């Protein structure tokens, strides 16, 4: 199991190469600031940018959950222990998004039709997308109506950006 850390002035992502996570047909999986990559998979600039978009989406959800629980604690006296729910919140919201897409046709593209994946697919070719975060804060919400942003099969996605 190899590990490396990518740092720039805007974000930090710990990359873990292993054979267990991600599972199935996926080549990479982002969980907050950890990027799990299958052994033997080349980490291209486009794939790294795609996963950085997912990292930003998840950190936005964590921030909102933390701010919401702090506000609820200060305003209504709700227990501060609810702040612990902010950590698994992105995974639960991702799962809910995919579950909603499973209920809507076409069923075979549920993950690709989720608003989170649609935002990442449409913007993975732009190396500056994650650096201009203030312009794209909660941009995944605009990708919820998937008729405006249809699913792009892998063979029709934009070519890889230059490294």
Give each language-model segment a name.
Residues 25-48:
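Short pre-active-site segment immediately N-terminal to the catalytic Zn-binding motif
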Residues 59-75:
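Membrane-interfacial alpha-helical segments at the cytosolic side of multi-pass membrane proteins
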Residues 1-6:
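Short, small-residue-biased leader/transition segments that mark boundaries at the very start
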Residues 46-58:
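Active-site recognition of the HExxH zinc-binding catalytic motif
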Residues 14-19, 23-26, 73, 80-163:
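Metalloprotease/metallohydrolase-associated module, dominated by Zn2+-dependent proteases
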Residues 39, 56-57, 124:
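Activation segment
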Residues 33, 54, 120:
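Divalent metal-coordination and catalytic microenvironments
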């Amino acid at each position: 199991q190899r590990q490396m850390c990518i740092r720039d002035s805007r974000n930090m992502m710990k990359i873990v190469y292993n054979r267990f996570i991600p599972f199935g047909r996926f080549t990479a999986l982002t969980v907050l600031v950890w990027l799990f990559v299958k052994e033997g998979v080349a980490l291209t600039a486009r794939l790294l940018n795609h996963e950085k978009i997912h990292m930003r989406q998840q950190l936005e959800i964590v921030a909102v959950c933390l701010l919401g629980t702090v506000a609820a604690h200060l305003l209504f006296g709700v227990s501060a222990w609810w702040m612990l729910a902010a950590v698994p919140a992105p995974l639960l919201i991702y799962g809910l998004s995919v579950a909603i897409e499973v209920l809507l046709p076409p069923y075979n593209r549920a993950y690709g039709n989720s608003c989170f994946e649609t935002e990442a697919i449409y913007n993975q070719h732009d190396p500056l997308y994650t650096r201009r975060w203030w312009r794209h804060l909660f941009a995944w919400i605009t990708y919820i109506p998937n008729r405006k942003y249809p699913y792009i099969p892998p063979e029709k996605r934009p070519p890889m950006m230059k490294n």
